[in-house]
């Protein structure tokens, strides 16, 4: 009998967790600034409400997006694609994006020959990612590029007085900066 009731108990526990998180979102926006979320946002948010139950780091991004969507003063910053971006991120992608945005843009001029200039740039500028396998970092960069959040460039400059130089850069584009401003943890709490 207990096993038969498990699905109902589990569903009730999820509902309680969801209710708590939605209440937290609502309470974080001053009452005088509360607004109904745009209709184009509400449907997509409802389809992806599972992101609010995620405990891998994506929950904070979705929660901040919801805060902006119901905040009259910040609604204009919300873009329909932000939900899809969060849905397409791995926890490693979210962590990489958070660390990258804090020291944006990443730029280096490498005078020594390195096999993978982008990897060297990340190794030098974001040492917090050293514990991640290089394949995970490469996948995160590729995914963020594919989502049109970051732009990267690698160019070789020959003939300078110090020999050949490889200029490598990874930066958020304007869309990526907007996404970070709206969705990254603590970015929406500063002006509440």
Cite the ranges covered by each PLM segment.
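Charged, alpha-helical interface segments at or near domain boundaries
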Residues: 1-89
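Short amphipathic alpha-helical interaction segments
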Residues: 36-42, 127-158, 165-167
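Amphipathic, non-membrane alpha-helical segments in soluble helical-bundle scaffolds
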Residues: 55, 94, 134-137
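Generic structural signal for hydrophobic core residues of well-folded globular domains
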Residues: 65-69, 86-89, 100-104, 144, ...
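Short amphipathic alpha-helical interface segments
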Residues: 79-129
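Short, amphipathic alpha-helical interaction segments positioned at domain boundaries
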Residues: 161-192
């Amino acid at each position: 009998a207990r096993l038969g009731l498990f699905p109902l108990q589990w569903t009730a526990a999820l509902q309680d967790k969801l209710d708590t998180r939605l209440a937290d979102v609502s309470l974080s926006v001053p009452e005088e600034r509360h607004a109904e979320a745009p209709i184009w946002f509400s449907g997509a948010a409802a389809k992806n409400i599972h992101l609010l139950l995620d405990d891998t780091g994506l929950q904070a991004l979705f929660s901040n997006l919801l805060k902006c969507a119901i905040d009259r003063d910040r609604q204009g910053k919300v873009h329909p694609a932000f939900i899809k971006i969060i849905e397409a991120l791995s926890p490693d992608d979210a962590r990489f994006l958070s660390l990258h945005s804090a020291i944006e843009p990443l730029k280096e001029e490498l005078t020594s020959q390195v096999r993978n200039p982008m990897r060297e740039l990340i190794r030098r500028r974001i040492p917090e990612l050293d514990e991640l396998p290089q394949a995970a970092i490469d996948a995160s960069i590729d995914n963020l590029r594919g989502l049109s959040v970051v732009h990267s460039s690698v160019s070789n400059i020959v003939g300078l007085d110090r020999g050949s130089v490889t200029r490598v850069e990874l930066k958020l584009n304007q869309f990526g900066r907007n996404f970070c401003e709206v969705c990254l943890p603590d970015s929406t709490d500063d002006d509440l």
